[in-house]
A protein has these predicted regions:
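Catalytic domains that recognize anionic headgroups
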Residues: 1-35, 43-392
Length: 392
């Protein structure tokens, strides 16, 4: 297990929900099996040569040594980080999701992982998209600063790179709490709401930052299922490759067990959940200015949806892009029908692209920083802007 988990981890499949094609890992299956067989033979030879009592004694010493290391590690972590304490976290709810200002609205509509090149391939098959994006300007030279949301979104909101001068979590919290962009909006009288379920913050960190925050506690509603998934995570690293297909699962499912809503309904970033809300919920009107950051799943793995936002078994990256546009068009139409479209600044963008040639798609694991992830989409519409779709 030690050798497998420390020296044979270069080409591990992703745990982000990507549908893994295990046939691409045959060489890893063979290498892993050979190593395990060799180690088993060596252990058997040692058992015969050194005799049972000596092997038993050696294994006992090694086991006690490893146990002491684990106990000391857990002790230090429990003292310094209160790991056994049920902590409260700030999460974002659906509160005021469709509350719009009769004065001015500023909306950032973020579709995760939509690559510009692949987006245009889908666009060309759907002429209705151009009519839906009337009044917008598309910027075809946008580049993402980072390849993943965790780093990319704080950069988008602040223009500030993470330079490792502080712990990343402190940088992230500072950006979400008081980036110059957010501070400017507050000075202009905007009420800020953030609709996202990818982030959680420790209690107190985000107090007063957004209008739709609630506190949730850890709630392991199915301990046996949770423990099974944790064991599977360990198996993905330390088990031989022949067992890894049985250990794979989407780690985002842990999040669904970790948090339980305290009072209000938590926001869900899934395209189908938001699409349902768009169809069923009514827009309400207020006088003050409103800012909304809406972060949806977009074309992020795992792929669930067809272009009509139905859950299907054979969904892929392109159908997920289609579902993203269906949700986007429905939202824009809702704003138009409610009369709050013209008085809204609307930015539709992705935080990064997607490496369509990457892991579990056509070839085995590539460098995670493939340039395909650096080309997002960016559409911008200003107040009372009226013209055909423009490309800049």
């Amino acid at each position: 297990c030690y050798i497998q988990g420390n020296y044979m981890v270069k080409n591990l499949p992703p745990l982000d929900g990507t549908d893994v094609n295990w046939s691409l890992y045959q060489s890893q299956f063979v290498k892993s099996t050979i190593v395990w067989v060799i180690i088993a033979i060596v252990c058997l030879i040692l058992f015969i040569v050194l005799k049972y009592d000596r092997i038993k004694k050696a294994v006992s010493y090694i086991s006690v040594f490893l146990l002491l290391i684990l106990v000391s590690t857990i002790t230090v972590l429990s003292i310094n980080n209160n790991i056994f304490e049920k902590k409260e976290y700030a999460r974002f709810t659906k509160v005021d999701q469709f509350e719009m200002s009769t004065d001015t609205n500023f909306i950032i509509f973020l579709l995760d992982a939509v690559d510009e090149e692949c987006f245009w391939q889908v666009w060309q098959e759907h002429p209705e998209y151009e009519d839906a994006m009337t009044d917008f300007t598309f910027y075809n030279n946008a580049m993402s600063g980072y390849a993943y949301t965790e780093h990319s979104l704080p950069l988008i909101l602040s223009g500030e790179w993470f330079e490792n001068k502080e712990p990343f979590i402190d940088y992230r919290n500072r950006i979400f709490k008081s980036s110059p962009f957010f501070n400017y909006l507050r000075e202009q009288g905007y009420t800020l709401s953030n609709y996202d379920d990818e982030y959680k913050f420790e209690k107190g960190v985000m107090d007063g930052a957004f209008n739709n925050i609630t506190y949730t506690k850890s709630s392991l509603w199915d301990r046996s299922l949770f423990n099974t998934r944790i064991i599977k995570m360990v198996g993905m690293k330390y088990a031989p490759y022949v067992l890894k297909p049985y250990c794979w699962f989407n780690v985002s499912m842990l999040k669904n067990q970790e948090m339980g809503s305290k009072d209000e309904e938590l926001f869900s970033w899934r395209n189908d959940d938001f699409y349902k809300d768009v169809q069923e919920d009514d827009i309400t009107y207020v006088d003050g200015k409103r800012f909304k950051l809406i972060h949806l799943m977009g074309a992020h793995v795992p792929f669930y949806f067809d272009k009509d936002v139905n859950v299907i078994d054979d969904a892929d990256y392109y159908t997920s892009i289609g579902s993203s546009m269906t949700v986007t068009m429905a939202y824009l139409n809702k704003l138009r029908e409610a009369g709050v479209y013209d008085n809204s600044v609307i930015i539709i963008l992705s935080d990064h692209g997607y490496n369509i040639e990457g892991e579990a798609v056509k070839v085995a694991q590539k460098n995670e920083n493939e340039t395909g992830r650096q080309h997002p989409i960016l559409f911008v519409k200003g107040l009372n802007e009226s013209h055909d779709l423009q490309v800049s």
